[in-house]
Every structure is written in C-alpha cells, then in structure tokens.
Amino acid sequence: MACGKTESGDDSGRFGRTGAGMFGFIMPGFVGIFRLSFFLLLSFAMASGSSSPASVPVSVAASVPDTTVNKIVISDGSEAHNINEFYDVKCHSHFYGLSVSSFASIWMMVNAIVFICAFGVFMRHWCYKAFTSDTAKGY
C-alpha cells in the first residue's frame, strides 16, 4: 500500500476542485452569457428609443406675461439643436439623442460580439479540457 493511491473519498486529488463534477464549471459560464445577452438587448432597446411623441406636448403661448420675461423656460428638447451649444457649460448631454447607426454604437456592438464569441471559445476549450482530464483520470 505504500505505492498505491489512497481512496479517501474527499476528492483532494482533483486539482483543488470539489466533487461536484462539471456543473460548477459550466453553469456560471451559461449564467454569465445569459446575463450579458440580456444586458446587451436591454441596452440596444434603450438606445433605439421610441418614435412616439412626448406624452406632454410643449405649448407656446401667444403672449408672455411680464412676470416670466427673464425666466428660463424648460422644454422637452425635441426642437432642433444648435451644435455650438454642445460646448457650452450649460449644455445638458441628455438633450442630444443617441443614434444606433452612428460609428461609435456600431463599434461598441462589434466589440461586444467579439468578446462574447471569444468568451464562448474560451469556455468551450476550458470545459473540454476539464472534461477530458476528468474522463482520462480513471484510466
């Protein structure tokens, strides 16, 4: 028995892994992929926006009372934008709408797809390597 393998049943010789098998390795990868795909779909839906008009229309009064002459009137930001206002300190970035067809958004989507594919290839290689090492361990 000095040269034989001790069978203690605690799976201490399995490269530090527990005896749970492949489930502990595969399942977090799938959960991560599902969460990432849900996040990307949600981001794409939010970025595409809605084409319906605002729920509360902005009305312009024909005559302005004297009490509101020097006050700032807040609008919903649906009118045309002046590009020079973008560099103004008082500019609010949420007035400028997102475009899904812009170069930056397309570049981000391509990067996300590349990272998802790379993660899938990595997980496939890692799980296959763990599967073959577990299968060949008994022989």
Curated annotation (Swiss-Prot):
Tell me what topology the record assigns in the membrane. Single-pass type I membrane protein
Localization recorded for this chain is: Virion membrane; Host membrane; Host Golgi apparatus, Host trans-Golgi network
Q: Supply one GO CC term from the record.
A: host cell Golgi apparatus
Broad class of the protein's primary localization? virion
User: Hey, which stretches end up on the Virion surface side?
Assistant: 1-100
UniProt signal peptide: none
Q: Which residues lie on this side of the membrane: Intravirion?
A: 122-139
Task: State whether it acts alone or in a complex, and with which partners, per the record.
Answer: Interacts (via N-terminus) with gM (via N-terminus). The gM-gN heterodimer forms the gCII complex.
> What exactly does this protein do?
Envelope glycoprotein necessary for proper maturation of gM and modulation of its membrane fusion activity. Also plays a critical role in virion morphogenesis.
This one is known as Envelope glycoprotein N
Name the gene behind this protein. Answer: gN
